[in-house]
Amino acid sequence: MDSIRQYFKRSDKIYLLLCIFSSVMAVLALSSWAAKQGNGFATDEVTGAIIGIGDYRRALVQAGASVIGIVIALLLSCVDYRSLVKVWPVHVVLTWGLVLPTLVIRNVSIGPLTIGYNAGDTDNYSWYKLGGFTFQPTELAKISFILTFAMHLNNVRSRINEPKELAKLLLHLLVPIAIIHVQGDDGTAIIYGIIGCCMMFAAGLSWKYIFAAFAAAGAAVAVAFAFFSDKIGKGYQWYRILAVLDPENTTGWAPSETVWKNIIYQQQRGEIALGSGGIFGNGLFTGRYYSVPNAHNDFILSWIGNVAGFVGCCVVLGVLLALVIKTFATGARSEDRLGSYTGAGIGGALMAQIAVNVGMNLRVLPVIGVTLPFYSAGGSSVLMLYICVGLVLSVYSHNTKSLFS
């Protein structure tokens, strides 16, 4: 009993409660969505009898994954994060060993397992499918990347602004980004980039390099759009970007009206759904609703706005913002740099995913397949998220004083 009491005394209970609250709200939102999809249940076409849980399966999977994830987070919080960094060769081989086959193997089935599965019929072949479940190994590799990059930064320390050391760090960052780009998952590649930038900023990267990076990125994007837009990337990716800049197609970027309507349809419906809820929403299980493609996944925020209104969105995003702040704060209070960089990496991942997903739903950023943490449907992504939660709790509970005190 004393050991349990001591554990809860040194753990970040508020952080864990915020995570649990988000998971409960996610299951509620997905249940609400399922209820509007033909009553959610699978029925017999002739008799109308209920023969399965239908779309409620997503809410059930989310609930089950959240419970398992919470247990994993609690167990992981008891493990010193430093020991996980020390065994970096193990998780690097395991995680990237799952990622690399998807570069060359596309939709190949070995019994019930499909390698290089393109979930959602896109050009993103970064998934594995086992029976009725899908898994994206780059999410697990993201955790390994944060730990190894934190170790790299910890080894470099004050030498981070030396060109030779900075070049090595950029190589460490750009190699996984390039691998993920080849897979066709540019959304995840962008998240990796933001994670790396947050961690290097926390490590003391000079502002001159930060400004130079932004200037170079801006110039590269401008040149790409001006001279190479027909050669770089896949057509639909550029169309999605142009649809945000010119949603009415006044410049004629879309080759046909059909392409234009197909590209803008999801965000257009999401924008309507988000605004239709007004202040308090149309009701979780009653009232009108607007159909939005992937409302259970990338566009779950539009669904929340539809059923719970502006107030519901503020509650959801307010709690997520609190989690981001507490994650960065946990890193800042760490007594060693390794914990500080780990917190910065996980905080950067959360911040990036939330910002990009909200931007997609508000139609200010293109659709790039980035999910909303805790809320978007997906059992494997929830489990990976709670592993990150466990790491943050580990940093919190294994530090008794601040690095900056």
Language model: regions and residue ranges:
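Hydrophobic alpha-helical transmembrane segments
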Residues: 63-72, 141-142, 307-325
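Membrane-helix boundary/helix-loop-helix interface segments in multi-pass membrane proteins
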Residues: 2-9, 13-17, 22, 28-29, ...
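Transmembrane alpha-helix boundary/anchor motif
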Residues: 71, 79, 148, 222, ...
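Transmembrane alpha-helix boundary and packing residues in multipass membrane permease domains
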Residues: 74, 147, 151, 196, ...
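Interfacial segments of multi-pass membrane proteins
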Residues: 153, 190, 195-209, 285-312, ...
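Loop-to-helix entry and N-terminal half of a specific, functionally important transmembrane alpha helix
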Residues: 330-369
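Hydrophobic, glycine- and aromatic-enriched re-entrant/interface helices and adjoining loop segments
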Residues: 112, 118-127, 212-315, 335-339
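Hydrophobic alpha-helical segments of polytopic membrane proteins
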Residues: 71, 89-96, 163-181, 186-229, ...
